[in-house]
């Protein structure tokens, strides 16, 4: 194998040797192609800044991209970044830092590696009325707002929308807020429900409002002022002790870092992918979230009947939040020992292809989910740690798969996420084995530590298996440890452990479950509907042990096996 080296301190006119490395990934890729794909590209430590997405295709089949010293104690840490370092700060009298950033557009900011949230206030001031075009309030405070974004958390218990404002004007004694279209129009079409006799239409009142300079009240937050096109101003209220001369402030610019399409046997090892954004929620279309990583872009909606006159509407088709690293229609690709952090969308997506493996990776500090896998065969998602994801798109699962065949999700740890830990939509032959989820569903509701919906096969041989998982602390209201939902069928749920859940599991859902078996599970409270299982559910040999110490002792072998293997 040809050995190629690349370093931020290198030079593309050099030969790409260990002593005289290339400077850019593009030059290293060209050299690897010249070697017919039989090459290992060693990335030296430091920040490899991209100015455009790094593309890998069929011509790159067989190439390995890995950290220098990969697998050795002296392994280096190469960071593939789509960010721009912000300098030239001036400090206002009130302590706010200001930087002229031209036409920079971003939704995130990182200070010394820490995520700085956008400045926000809770909801709209005054007495507020929702209309078909926006809102009316008797407060004059919004008249000074510019480029703000409305966040609508919990329109449905599992949704969080983000919508833009088109204009704010005074009309008599009222302030009229006109929302941007088509986003607000789509929200009005999608969010229609009746629950316990109460009808609701539209997104309702915002639960928070983000990104106006007047909101800079909490240290460690930022605003991007875009009032003057092409002359944007970044504003940051520092934490105590932070100084502009010594702080490293990075604004993500690219939306995609790496796109790998149509390749075979490519390996990514020991790399850090960081500092990318996703600008779509800030556009007039907004982010009309429906479920998980899916959002609505108009089109037909239908009712999901919940019984007793209750219903919600749902889209017949939805779009998936993109990932900052994308693998498409690739076979035999390996992603091992990588970290996905400080990203403005999903960390990694796998779509199509066969035999893609994601192992021993870390996913943290992400606006969206950790990993999404769609329409692929024989994928393996194993021994990964997912923590602190869904920081801006709260419905995002830690790990989500849909439309797959023979996918294995095993020995992962998913913790501290706002909604579901592991989600499996309709598919065939999914195996969810020996995972650990903890402190999931911290923000939104009606989800599960492990959640499945839709048909999972057409027989016991082709169905899903959920075995040996340990699910802890889904404690927020109206949530479940194990959740087979919305017409799930051909699912075997056995030998799992559920502790400290609002509800351990639920057996009665709509549409009803078919050919679902709960067998030999352990939990600290009986599932909802255990005493009267529906006809489509087999419920046998499950054990309820209310005492935590006794439950732990009885399930120690299962718990020892769950989670990331050393």
Give names to the regions the model predicted.
Residues 122-123, 153, 275-279, 476-565:
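Extracellular beta-rich repeat passengers
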Residues 37-39, 59-64, 259-267, 296-305, ...:
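Surface-exposed loop/turn motifs in large extracellular/passenger domains
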Residues 5-329, 334:
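Extracellular polysaccharide-degrading/modifying enzymes targeting complex plant/algal/animal polysaccharides
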Residues 245-249, 273-324, 336-337, 346, ...:
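Acidic/polar low-complexity surface segments
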Residues 397-399, 404, 412-417, 421-484, ...:
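C-terminal structured domain segments across diverse proteins
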Residues 52-53, 255-256, 277-283, 322, ...:
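Short glycine/acidic-rich loop motifs that flank beta-strands on beta-rich extracellular proteins
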